[in-house]
Amino acid sequence: MSCVLTGVVPLGLVLLLCGAQGFFLPNVTQLEKLLSKYQGDQPHSRTRRAISRADREEILTLHNKLRGQVSPPASNMEYMTWDEELEKSAVAWARECIWEHGPTSLLVSIGQNLAVHWGRPRSPGSHVQSWYDEVKDYTYPYPHECNPWCPERCSGPMCTHYTQIVWATTNRIGCAVNTCPRMNVWGDVWENAVYLVCNYFPKGNWIGEAPYKTGQPCSECPGKYRGGCKNNLCYQETYGQETETDDMNEVEAAPIPDEKHVWVTPRVIKPKKPKKDSPVNYMTQVVKCDTKMKDKCKGSTCNRYQCPAGCLHSGAKIFGTLFYESASSICRAAIHYGILDDRGGLVDVTRNGKVPFFVKSERNGVQSLSKYKASSSFTVSKVKVQDLDCYTTVAQLCPYEKPGTHCPRVRCPAHCKDEPSYWAPVFGSNIYADTSSICKTAVHAGVIRNESGGYVDVMPVDKKKTYVASLRNGVQSESLRTPRDGKAFRIFAVRQ
C-alpha cells in the first residue's frame, strides 16, 4: 500500500439548480433495500448508534453557533435540529466506505458534507470547524450584485462546505461516523480511516443564490417561527423539548407509564348525519362522437378526452388538416390525424389561436372539409401511459411551458404515503408546487388510495406565489412562499 501521511480530507457538494430536473429518485425496491440497513433483526432489539450522543451534540451545537455568527449578519438564518432519518441515510453511506458523495439517488433531495482522517484521533467538531473555515476564501454576494443570479465568489479550492453549513433554509442535519478498514482516498488506500458523513435538508448550495439574506438577525424569519429568535437564529420554542434520555446512546422501548384511572360522567353525544363524500374531480372528459371542441371546451380542464368506439363512420364533421377548426368533432379529428382508431380511446387537445383557413383531406378513412374563414383551431396528440415511483415530480416528468403542457397518464405504486418528505415532499394544497412527489400528492389529494395506488392525471400550470400546508388523508404537505423557480400542477382522479 502507498504510504500516506496522517491527514484530513474534506469533500463538498454543489447542487445545480438547472440540472436538478435531470435526476430521478430510486424506486420502492431500491429504497427498501437502503432502509433495511438501519433495521435490526428484532423490532425491539437494543442497537448502539453509529454516532455517540456526545459527538452528535458537538456537531449540532457547533453548527448553530457558527450559523449565528456569520458576517455579514443573516436576517433569515434558521436554527438547525438533528434528524433521525438523515442520520440513518448518513449511516448507510458511511458504511459503504466510498470516498465520494452518494448515493446518487438521494443527492437530488439532500445536501452533504464529507470528511475523512486516519492516524491521530480527531473529533467530528474539528471537521465541522475546518468546513466552516473555508469562509476565509468566500466573499458574500450582496443583493445589488445579483442580477438575477449571484456571482460565485470563492478564491480558494472550495467553499461549498462553508456555504452548506450557513445555508439559511437548511434546518435539519444528521451525521454518522464509521471506521473503514480500507478506504481508497483519491488513489491512496487508507487503513482504519475514520469517515464522517453529514446529510442536510433542505439542501443548499444552489448555484446563483446567496446562502442567506443579510440584515438584522431574525428580521426576515419564515412565519412558522412566529418571531422566535435565539442567538441570532430563527427559533421555535418546541426545539427545547428533548425526548431522548438514554445516556448510553442505545435505542430501546420507552417504559410504559403507570396506569391512572380518571372517573368522569359520560357525555351524551347526539348522532351526526353522515358526511357527504367530497366531489371527485376528473381532468378527462367523456365525450360522444359528435362532440365539438367549441361546445365542450369551456373550462381549464379541457385538454384530455375519452372517445367512445364507433366514431369512424359517424356523420360528425371535421374541418382542416393537422390544425382543426373548433367546430370539428374531437373524436373524428383524432381518427383523421391517426391517434385513434374505431375502438376509441384517450386524446389530448391543444387549443391554438386563429388560423386564416382550413384545408380538406382524407386520412384514415375520415374525410375532412375546407373552411376559408379565420377561426380558432386545435391540434390533437396521443396520450401516453407511464409507470412512476413514489419520488418522480412534475418538474422532472413534464414541467409547465406556455401555452400548455401535456403529461402522460401515470400509474402510481401503493404505499407512497409512507415515504419520508426528504425524498417524496408535498408542497401545497389543491394546487401543488411541481417539485412535489406526484404519487404522494395523489394520496394527499385523495385521488388514489395509499393501500392500492392507481392511475392519475396531472395538469401542469403556472407557478403560484404561495403554497399552503395541510394534513389530508394521512399526508402532511408543506408550505412554500414566493418560490423563485419552478411551476405548479393540479392532480385528478381517473375514472375506473
Curated annotation (Swiss-Prot):
Known function: Promotes matrix assembly.
UniProt xrefs under SMART domains: LCCL, SCP
Assembly, per entry: Binds to heparin, dermatan sulfate and chondroitin sulfate.
Localization, UniProt: Secreted
Disulfide links within the chain: C289-C307, C311-C331, C390-C412, C416-C439
Biological process terms in GO annotation: face morphogenesis
Domain annotation LCCL: ranges: 283-378, 384-487
Cellular component, GO annotation: extracellular space
Protein name: Cysteine-rich secretory protein LCCL domain-containing 2
Signal peptide: 1-22
Domain SCP: 60-200
GO-annotated molecular function: glycosaminoglycan binding
InterPro entries registered for this protein in UniProt: Allrgn_V5/Tpx1_CS (IPR018244), CAP_dom (IPR014044), CAP_sf (IPR035940), CRISP-LCCL_domain (IPR051957), CRISP-related (IPR001283), LCCL (IPR004043), LCCL_sf (IPR036609)
Pfam families listed in its UniProt record: CAP, LCCL
Keywords associated with the record: Disulfide bond, Glycoprotein, Repeat, Secreted, Signal
Glycan-linked positions: N27
